[in-house]
Amino acid sequence: MPDIKLKNQPFDVAFHPKEPVVFSSLLTGQVCAWSYDDATGETSSSWSVRPSKRTARALSIEENGDEIWMGGKSGSLFQLSTRDGSMTRERDSAHECPINRVYCVNRNLVATGDDDGVIKLWDPRQADSIRTYSQHFDYISDFTYFDDKRQLVATSGDGHLSVIDIRSNKSTPLTVSEDQEDELLSIVPIKGGQKAIVGSGLGILSVWNRQMGWADSVDRIPGHPASIDAIVALTPDIIATGSEDGMIRVIQVLPHKFLGVVATHEEFPVERIRLDRNNKWLGSVSHDECLKLTDVEDLFEDSDEDDEMEEDEPDSDEEKSKKKKKDNGMKDMSRGQAENDGSFFADL
């Protein structure tokens, strides 16, 4: 699998929404861009800039792909051109403490969250934030957005998630969940946005049903031996998780099933994972000074074929045997890719 060797530790990864370009932010305050081949994943450096001398922690790209936003340890917020890295705007001291997460909600709204739990909303056309929220008392770890209800959901190290109605002019959230008694580190929508999955510091995946509200989760999926720092949806029913133990696992949700390991950063914790515009390349960054691109296209093909096979149940023992061998395909592949760490199932 293609790896991009870096000179310093990366903290975030992002893909261009329209072109084969991947970005990463580094410990040194740099933001780097590479073009890659859609088929092979082979990369070539496009540009590298250093907007800040302090750690560049978080990246997010506007939906049109023209600009990428960066926040970090300095508390400042930067807008850069995705074409050449040139700075289009700097908001000095946008937060009073380090920015931990940046999220482009839509073309007219960007959310940022800092180490103290403060959330700010920004209009790209204005210099100052348009609203500030302070319902959390520990760092903001992740954001996701549900467009049907115009709801921005934030997770925090304080054990709560909160929901913000972006249409409201009030600086108070729509709701704050009950204390989950664990750090909430990552979130992603599943099932076409009907539900959400949240990763925690103790290695638990919690399932949240939007129809039942955001007060508490409705189900829990144990099994990860370490914290779940990053999540991405591969299909409406299948997610990939990046964990503190360096492994990227694939999990089916409802019904719950651990499918295997698709990549590993050895013993280094996975900081972030992202999926590219074609759902082929999974980008991941860790403390190993490497941006890894993993081809996950076959997983989608297997999922589609499995769905068809479930609809047409096998009539013979021979057909059942073939299906069983096919289901074991990703498990075998996973063991091969993570042979230095042992199989995924042995770790649980």
Swiss-Prot record:
Cellular compartments annotated: Nucleus, Nucleolus
Principal cellular location given in the protein's record: nucleus
Chain residue ranges for the region called Disordered: 299-348
SMART domains according to UniProt: WD40 (SM00320)
Biased composition (Acidic residues): 299-318
WD repeats: 5-44, 51-90, 94-132, 135-174, 179-218, 223-261, 264-304
Pfam families in UniProt: WDR55 (PF24796)
Keywords tagged on the record: Nucleus, Repeat, WD repeat
One GO term describing the cellular component: nucleolus
Recorded superkingdom: Eukaryota
Family that this chain belongs to: Belongs to the WD repeat WDR55 family.
Protein name: WD repeat-containing protein JIP5
